[in-house]
Amino acid sequence: MAKVEVQQQGDLLEKLIAVNRVSKVVKGGRIFSFTALTVVGDGNGRVGFGYGKAREVPAAIQKAMEKARRNLVDVDLNGNTLQHPIKGRHSGSKVYMQPASEGTGIIAGGAMRAVLEVAGVQNVLSKCYGSTNPINVVRATINALTEMTSPDQVAAKRGLSVTQILG
């Protein structure tokens, strides 16, 4: 289950998706440590995720936030929704997202919702298939968002005008 915490730092929105206790078994017993999964975005088309591991929870969260800030990618949004329906996949997780009309809101669950919120998407319909492991869902969602192309990019590739592309 993805537990989401929001924090604003500077111009970036930060969300904590999950914290897990993990253990390493050694000769003398178990050594416990914590992992944290976070997403960071500016609410305007930039999003990144980070995964941190440390002996203490705050240190794991701090590491994850720093990694997320270093891994920001740009997403080409159409106002406050997506350009077109998209699919993303990572490992056993598959995600499907499609643009929605104004006032729909973010219809997404758990980890996918956190990514879409910090990316600045406000109206979207989405569904996660297969594995709902938060790490894989976050990676699949970001993969899908980065694969999205705007009509301008499609027109440039095809050598046509945007009006010809849109019909």
UniProtKB/Swiss-Prot annotation:
Source domain of life is Bacteria
Q: Which InterPro entries match?
A: Ribosomal_Su5_D2-typ_SF (IPR020568), Ribosomal_uS5 (IPR000851), Ribosomal_uS5_bac-type (IPR005712), Ribosomal_uS5_C (IPR005324), Ribosomal_uS5_N (IPR013810), Ribosomal_uS5_N_CS (IPR018192), Ribsml_uS5_D2-typ_fold_subgr (IPR014721)
Q: Which residues form the S5 DRBM domain?
A: 12-75
Statement: the UniProt record of this protein carries the keyword RNA-binding: yes
Please name the Pfam families in this protein's record. Ribosomal_S5, Ribosomal_S5_C
What GO terms are given for molecular function? rRNA binding; structural constituent of ribosome
- What Gene Ontology biological process does one annotation of this record name? translation
Q: Does the keyword Mitochondrion apply?
A: no
Recorded hits in SUPFAM superfamilies, A to Z, give:
dsRNA-binding domain-like (SSF54768), Ribosomal protein S5 domain 2-like (SSF54211)
Q: Which GO terms describe its cellular component?
A: small ribosomal subunit
Keywords from UniProt, A to Z, are: Ribonucleoprotein, Ribosomal protein, RNA-binding, rRNA-binding
In the record's own words, the domains note is: The N-terminal domain interacts with the head of the 30S subunit; the C-terminal domain interacts with the body and contacts protein S4. The interaction surface between S4 and S5 is involved in control of translational fidelity.
Role according to the record: With S4 and S12 plays an important role in translational accuracy. Located at the back of the 30S subunit body where it stabilizes the conformation of the head with respect to the body.
What does the similarity note say? Belongs to the universal ribosomal protein uS5 family.
Q: PANTHER family from the xrefs?
A: MITOCHONDRIAL RIBOSOMAL PROTEIN S5
Q: Subunit notes for this chain?
A: Part of the 30S ribosomal subunit. Contacts proteins S4 and S8.
Identification of the protein by name: Small ribosomal subunit protein uS5
Q: Native species of this protein?
A: Pseudoalteromonas atlantica (strain T6c / ATCC BAA-1087)
Quote the gene name from the UniProt entry.
rpsE
